[in-house]
Amino acid sequence: MTIKSIKHKHYDKLVTLGCIICKKMGFPNSHAEIHHINEGRIGKRANFRMCLPLCPSHHRNGIESYHYSPKKFTKKWGTQKQLLTLVNKMLR
């Protein structure tokens, strides 16, 4: 398997899992996009395994979305690393 195929297989698993925030709210079958955790590096994407499945509302569209207000999102749902730990447990 190539790195590219491993990466796409991982992304497929994330999308199939659905939005991690919607799951926490009791809505298990939501559509998900890939959110790359940037680990504080401006303009740099994280390793493909450092990604979260988020629906458009929790990723970039809503007033509680990560990209609208990272601080508000983190206060309500936890850090990206905490969410990543939860996602990784669910993928096992």
Which sequence ranges carry the predicted segments?
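Short cysteine-rich loop/turn motifs with clustered Cys
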Residues: 4-33, 57
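Conserved catalytic motifs of the protein kinase core domain
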Residues: 30, 50-51
